[in-house]
């Protein structure tokens, strides 16, 4: 009775065609309304938050900064929640602490938490520091780099225009977190003190500084309230111009006045000269626009472009501007390519189905499942607050081949009954009843496979949650269509006793031949079952080798139309050196025919390095891939001895990390000298390994430092205090901000310093004077002694331990996974006692993800096994079905290994290829379900043995298995020939599924029947239950 009711469920839709059509139309309508409401992104929303705490302490050395500023802040900040890691750099005059938050941490809450921790220790920080600046960003590279240059205006004037006119406009765009200015030469009122003239006037530094501060103050004078009129008071107590500041009286003795111009030169000039930028060889000022942690780069860039065009029209006649790099160009190109692939895959699937069916009328039945499923799933994306992104679009490509499977199986079964003499209506009723359970089982099995991906954490989980649920949603809808619309259409469109067309005859003839060949070969296999079983065992035994022989990486290297190059020079050099050293490199870059723009920023990200972004021409305008261009440029870079430089790919997934793809951090509580020696040995081993084309260590003792010792006894006899010495040296050398002035409505720093000629070498100290307690000038050199030492440029820390970071770019042919594995082994075997190691950049993400996908794969296998066990009420039958999984996986791995041998990009174990392997689990088990379900029914209803049942089932289900496999494989063919942005990732997942499904299907058709004959449950016909019979 239960069986009859269950099977009659599908009859409703055959008998009520309007109901079947209405259900499908409803899904299409809901899907169409969702299209305009879904956001378009590169990847699913992934919040990466990096908080930076910057503190300036002008004139202080790195050790002082670390002891009194960095360490105090670190201790407090470490108590904040959701920190992934914290690193810091203590450099002369500045402390920078970088806090990388865990993925998808609320950026506003994280910023507030860190800010509270900073404020808690501000009172414990030294006097003389500037207030710590706390900022939050996504941490990745800017989404857009824009250059500004002029043949008439100098860099200070260009920078001033950008700060006053351009930057404020970009900040009006929602989603812009930061606008960095590189090559900037910001204006400041520079006071170039003359130590000898000050000594001649008996003026001490405190006297000069006090006069400057006391005579430039902002006054809030309130209002005058009369009986009827109120007046606002404005008191001009600030300096408004260079002339006013120059005429400032520093001291007076009757008519003898000493003005600032008598002891110093005052001018409006550059605040500092820490970075230089060039664009295509021309000196420029470059803006980098960084989005907020939660912003959609595509939306932000879309708003920037019209604003930028408006800004260009406002530029002075002598100023020019270009967009040097736009990250969203590659994103939009990749999305466009994927959408195009969806169209191509649909056409190919249509042709393949036609080749198997041969009837234009019949082909409508499975083909309609494609638009209904693809459009219908959009309503699910909307309900889950998902977006249209590369992952959901990739899921739709895979779905094209999947969603027709169920409809094909239903169509084929109904068509078989029509050819057996049934009317289309009866064939639809009988055929759908027979196939309903396998269809539901296959749908549940596929959904079960993807569910573990939706439960994963980390980057992989964030990326593939939407992928998995999109694919599962499309499969669910296709199952609904297969059991509602497809049977109804079959009853209306298919004809009994109709004369076959020429194409139908050819198709039938060809498939008949295939069927007969398969039957013959299967019979041979079943006669030699032990040989086939041995073959299967051999295949299974090769799986560990096939896995281990593949390289691993987080994501394959893509041709993104742009790449980064980092140049490093010795720590002791200045910005002039690095700029000149990089000129030959950039000349080689610009002479490369595929290069469109070349940007070089000397002095970034550190004072002795250069950040370079090279933009290539459109993919259609060049024949060479990005990797080939980078390799050529890297080879030419080896001939430049002054600087170590290497190009590397922009990270495919923006995880808030910057720099080369591999960075290992050595940590210890020991002193920096010991750490530097250990790091140098580790670096030497890396260079000797031949696995890295570029390496750079951030802790080297090669920077000259003058250690000044004060004779406190002698200074005391003169009445000279340590505070006086500190203030004098600070005002002469550090370039500290004394006060600020208002010029044309904009605040500028007032910076005191001696001229460059008076600070070229330690000998300059002989011209510095202090004021003794009796008012006489005393040479500074008389109370100090100096010793030249070598020190690091900066003192880095990681997780509150002294650290040394080695950044590296693996050699071509060496994956980041292989490089990391070598580094882990090297560090484990060779680091001394008291040392540990960690990773940064892309390497950190790869290590953190670890075996997450392997666990997901195992979980998918377990879940689908349990689902099948429930369906078959057996443990052994699911084991037989699952035997096809290692067969398919071996096919995929063999293909990856062969292609990897020929250095084909994307043939590594990465998140895309591993997701392809997980997808294979669901696809290949469908074959086993189809065969085992028929075999089970044959045993229950016809009393056949296991061998007879599975042989019959394999022959009956050959055609739908071949059709569904061909449809799936054909739908993925465009991925194998993908070009342009994102092509390698699409190829990676495509080749795994195509190779695995094709080879796995061939193996399954022969191995599964053999295994079934040995392992499967013997299904006995159930006894008829008589409710009137009494048992004792």
From Swiss-Prot:
Q: Which UniProt keywords apply?
A: Cell inner membrane, Cell membrane, Membrane, Transmembrane, Transmembrane helix, Transport
What is the membrane topology listed in the Swiss-Prot or TrEMBL record? Multi-pass membrane protein
The chain's Periplasmic topological domains, given as residue ranges, are 37-337, 384-389, 458-470, 549-852, 899-910, 980-992
Question: Where is this protein localized, as stated in its record?
Answer: Cell inner membrane
Transmembrane segments in this chain: where? 18-36, 338-357, 364-383, 390-411, 439-457, 471-493, 530-548, 853-872, 879-898, 911-932, 961-979, 993-1015
> Cross-referenced Gene3D superfamilies, in alphabetical order?
Multidrug efflux transporter AcrB pore domain, Multidrug efflux transporter AcrB pore domain like, Multidrug efflux transporter AcrB TolC docking domain, DN and DC subdomains, Multidrug efflux transporter AcrB transmembrane domain
Database matches in InterPro entries: AcrB_DN_DC_subdom, Acrflvin-R
The record's family statement is: Belongs to the resistance-nodulation-cell division (RND) (TC 2.A.6) family.
This protein is called what? Uncharacterized transporter HI_0895
